[in-house]
A protein has these predicted regions:
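Generic beta-sheet signal
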Residues: 46-48, 78, 102-104, 119, ...
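Short, glycine/acidic-enriched loop or turn micro-motifs at the edges of active sites
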Residues: 19, 23, 80-82, 106, ...
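Single conserved hydrophobic/aromatic residue that forms the stacking wall/gate
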Residues: 1-7, 11
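A structured phosphate/pyrophosphate-recognition subdomain
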Residues: 29-36, 109-176
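Hydrophobic/aromatic residues located in beta-strands of well-ordered beta-sheets
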Residues: 43-45, 99, 145
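Anionic-ligand anchoring segments at beta-strand to alpha-helix junctions in alpha/beta enzyme folds, i.e.
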Residues: 12-70
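Divalent metal-coordination and catalytic microenvironments
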Residues: 20, 30, 54, 76, ...
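Active-site cofactor/cluster-binding pocket
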Residues: 58-114
């Protein structure tokens, strides 16, 4: 994922319609990670307006809520099992040279050029975290990843919670 990002100048990330904690957390987690570690990349996040409960996340005010008619080198979709979940931003997906999907839904139909799908994972944030260099994750990224994990595990109550889920959440808590 990071090799693909480094080779891209215009880079777009997006989650699903009616964004929940995992969607917002994964899109902003990747956004903050790339801004910190690949500052030469132009990164844009497109989402429908998230709930105000996520206003504490770094990058929340940088989200664009309407599609732009422009070309993207790379388009990353997070927490989406199918293309119909990326409306109203389908044109952005179609205008990209390369597409990547990072997801955890068993129903994912592998619609992107490259698909990182782990149905055994609790959340897209958990899958996304496994693509990161742990030493390059900062507090802003950690808050986003933790938010997504908390939301999709019901604060660790749901059966999707695993030891790996808890280990990652613990690492994120240690960062602040």
């Amino acid at each position: 994922l990071m090799r693909s990002s480094a080779a891209s100048d215009v880079y777009k990330r997006q989650g699903h319609i009616r964004p929940d904690g995992d969607c917002v957390g994964s899109t902003l987690g990747l956004y903050n990670y790339i801004r910190k570690n690949l500052p030469e990349c132009q990164v844009t996040v497109y989402l429908e307006k998230p709930s105000d409960e996520f206003n504490y996340l770094s990058g929340i005010n940088d989200i664009k809520h309407e599609a732009e008619d422009k070309h993207f080198d790379l388009f990353v979709v997070l927490d989406c099992s199918s293309m119909d979940r990326i409306e109203p931003f389908m044109s952005c997906f179609e205008n990209a040279d390369k597409t990547i999907c990072i997801d955890h839904h068993i129903s994912n139909n592998s619609f992107a050029d490259v698909n990182y799908v782990e149905p055994q994972s609790s959340s897209a944030c958990e899958v996304l975290y496994t693509t990161f260099d742990e030493d390059k994750v900062d507090k802003n990224v950690a808050e986003c990843i933790y938010t997504g994990i908390i939301h999709d595990t019901g604060v660790f109550k749901y059966s999707c919670t695993s030891r790996r889920t808890m280990d990652i959440a613990g690492k994120m808590m240690e960062m602040g």
